[in-house]
Amino acid sequence: MARAALSAAPSNPRLLRVALLLLLLVAAGRRAAGASVATELRCQCLQTLQGIHPKNIQSVNVKSPGPHCAQTEVIATLKNGRKACLNPASPIVKKIIEKMLNSDKSN
């Protein structure tokens, strides 16, 4: 019985190393590919600001409701590189979005 177990193992240690390396690479690749999907399958804005001064905003990204999140999300990229979630129902945020949309149409 011990002999049967030994004969089932590969006799070439180099082949075993290559097979293990390939297995690790495949597992790491699947995990990395799944990581980005997992973050996209939920709302990005857990807390929102009621407003922010427009001079601090570099760009605004409005995400419509979808299978990943049931609410509209407004994500402002600030001039300092940070991102801030804004409340889409806030009158100030609505004006900021309108201003950004109008400036995009005029360019």
UniProtKB/Swiss-Prot annotation:
Q: Which residues form the signal peptide?
A: 1-34
Organism expressing this protein natively: Homo sapiens
What PANTHER family does this protein's entry cite? Answer: GROWTH-REGULATED ALPHA PROTEIN, SMALL INDUCIBLE CYTOKINE A
Can you name this protein? Growth-regulated alpha protein
How would you describe the post-translational modification of this protein? N-terminal processed forms GRO-alpha(4-73), GRO-alpha(5-73) and GRO-alpha(6-73) are produced by proteolytic cleavage after secretion from peripheral blood monocytes.
Gene name tied to this protein:
CXCL1
Query: Which GO cellular component terms, listed alphabetically, does the Swiss-Prot or TrEMBL entry include?
Result: extracellular region; extracellular space; specific granule lumen; tertiary granule lumen
Q: Where in the cell is it found?
A: Secreted
Listed GO MF terms: chemokine activity; enzyme activator activity; growth factor activity; signaling receptor binding
Q: Which UniProt keywords apply?
A: Cytokine, Disulfide bond, Growth factor, Inflammatory response, Secreted, Signal
Q: What does this protein do?
A: Has chemotactic activity for neutrophils. May play a role in inflammation and exerts its effects on endothelial cells in an autocrine fashion. In vitro, the processed forms GRO-alpha(4-73), GRO-alpha(5-73) and GRO-alpha(6-73) show a 30-fold higher chemotactic activity.
Q: What Pfam family is a match for this entry? A: IL8
Sorted alphabetically, which InterPro entries does this protein's record hold? Answer: Chemokine_b/g/d, Chemokine_CXC, Chemokine_CXC_CS, Chemokine_IL8-like_dom, CXC_Chemokine_domain, Interleukin_8-like_sf
Give the GO terms filed under biological process for this record: actin cytoskeleton organization; chemotaxis; G protein-coupled receptor signaling pathway; immune response; inflammatory response; intracellular signal transduction; negative regulation of cell population proliferation; nervous system development
Q: Coiled coil located at which positions?
A: none
Report the SS bond pairs: 43-69, 45-85
